[in-house]
Amino acid sequence: ISISENNGDITSELSKYRRLIDKYFLGYIDEEKLKEGAIKGYIEGLDDPYTEYISKEDMDDYMADATGNFVGIGIYMVKNTESNKIMVLSPIKGSPAEKAGILPGDLIISVDGVSYTAEDMSVASNKIKGEAGTTVKMEILRGTETKEFELKRESIKVNPVEGKVLQNNIGYIEFSSFDEGTADEFKAKFEELQRQGIKSLIIDLRNNGGGIVDEALQIADYILNKDDVILYEVDKNNKEKVEKAEKDPIIDMPIILLTNENTASSSEILAGALKDNGKAKIVGTKTYGKGVIQQLLTLPDGSGLKITSEEYLTPNRTKINKVGIEPDEEVKLPDSVKNVLKVEEKDDTQLQKAIEMAK
């Protein structure tokens, strides 16, 4: 069958294909699925790994993820455009994924026998989730080796902010994402360490894939001087918005940040703000390079559109997207370390360097 070309706008193009479907398609036409597929395909045509359509049915799960509470296996995922695969950015500490040995950089090939590409990330994410106690099978590509995992889903609470006092009265705080309440937990943990007499602070942002931007801004506000620039946000019309520290700092001591290639998004906002304002030195390796901000638009039918709407620049107007932030002191972990989430302190050359600089 030959179809004549008629390259018009999207509405006329869809109408053309609808007529062909109505005329020739043998099976049952599910109008809702057809509409949803058209929307997803349209948005995927933007070729942006962070912009996605969220169906009405998936919105509750999305909002639960944003607050740090959900049922699943506990991984942060990103679209890997080079391989067109879904990549594990990092597993959540203590989660089924971490316990099973899933690592940052692992590529997800299939979930319960169904293969997925980067464009299918939201579908795969929903497939991975389910009722607590049920299992999910995943096929993972690690380098050239394929591995299979069977994991039991659990109720996941993203780890709270953790902290301790190291040698020489050095405080140490780490957290794996910026979720609802992270800034308040960070402040409480710092005050707890301050009561124990810390004189300097190490903030570990390694494997922190980001999260809620406002939480990162609030933590920056605890450290920067009032009116210091935190970041610049630039929209599609080159209209610029400046985010500045609104209060006097509550943290006034030497700070070292730890970063690696899995430090992304909101973590990079915090790292860039503290580095450019001279409030912290960065130790580790270059960060991931996600320097764009998404906003969630809720539509009248209950569905949503998470859309990349702004690029951010550090206070020195340094571009981060697809570039990353260079550390002040580049320190790589030894080759003997195979799992960046489980590094023995004796092997943690990055932490050792941070301690040396914080003394």
Name the predicted role of every residue range.
Residues I1-K79, S83, L103, S110-V111, ...:
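Intrinsically disordered, Ser/Thr/Pro/Gly-rich linkers and terminal tails that flank
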Residues Q294-T298, L305-K338:
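Conserved P-loop NTPase
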Residues L89-S90, E98-A100, D112, S122-K290, ...:
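Cleft-lining beta-strand/loop regions that shape enzyme active-site pockets
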Residues G105-L107, S303:
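Structural motif
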Residues K85-I92, A118:
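Short, structured beta-strand/loop micro-motifs enriched in basic residues and often containing a Trp
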